[in-house]
């Protein structure tokens, strides 16, 4: 009888771990949309433009890992389009 009880405990523990992992997983699917108010501060013609309060609020509400994932996604676009890789040396 000990084996079924142990199996049930293991299954319950596994289910709890799955739930915790799902809760901790970040949803970064709309990170780029959230940061739309920042476009005027990061565009090519944004030399010295101060970010708006909306941009700063959006940035506060977006995790660093989501921002980084978004940047990596943009940088990976040329390869997905069969274009040369981005080289950003000498730029900020």
Curated annotation (Swiss-Prot):
Keyword terms: Disulfide bond, Secreted, Signal
Protein name according to UniProt: Male-cone protein 1
Entry keyword annotation includes DNA repair: no
Pfam families (UniProt xref): LTP_2 (PF14368)
Disulfide bonds: 28-66, 38-55, 56-81, 68-88
Subcellular location: Secreted
Highest taxon in the source lineage: Eukaryota
Record-stated family: Belongs to the A9/FIL1 family.
InterPro entries in the cross-refs: Bifun_inhib/LTP/seed_sf (IPR036312), Bifunc_inhib/LTP/seed_store (IPR016140)
Signal peptide: 1-25
KW Ligase (keyword) present: no
A GO-annotated cellular component: extracellular region
Gene3D superfamilies: Plant lipid-transfer and hydrophobic proteins
Source organism: Pinus radiata (Monterey pine)
SMART domains referenced in this protein's UniProt entry, alphabetically: AAI
């Amino acid at each position: 009888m000990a084996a079924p009880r142990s199996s049930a405990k293991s299954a319950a523990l596994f289910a709890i771990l799955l739930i915790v992992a799902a809760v901790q997983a970040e949803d970064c699917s709309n990170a780029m949309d959230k940061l739309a108010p920042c476009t005027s501060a990061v565009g090519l013609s944004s030399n010295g433009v101060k970010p708006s309060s909306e941009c700063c609020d959006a940035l506060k509400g977006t995790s660093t890992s989501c921002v980084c994932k978004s940047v990596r996604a943009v940088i990976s676009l040329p390869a997905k389009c069969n274009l040369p890789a981005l080289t950003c040396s000498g730029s900020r």
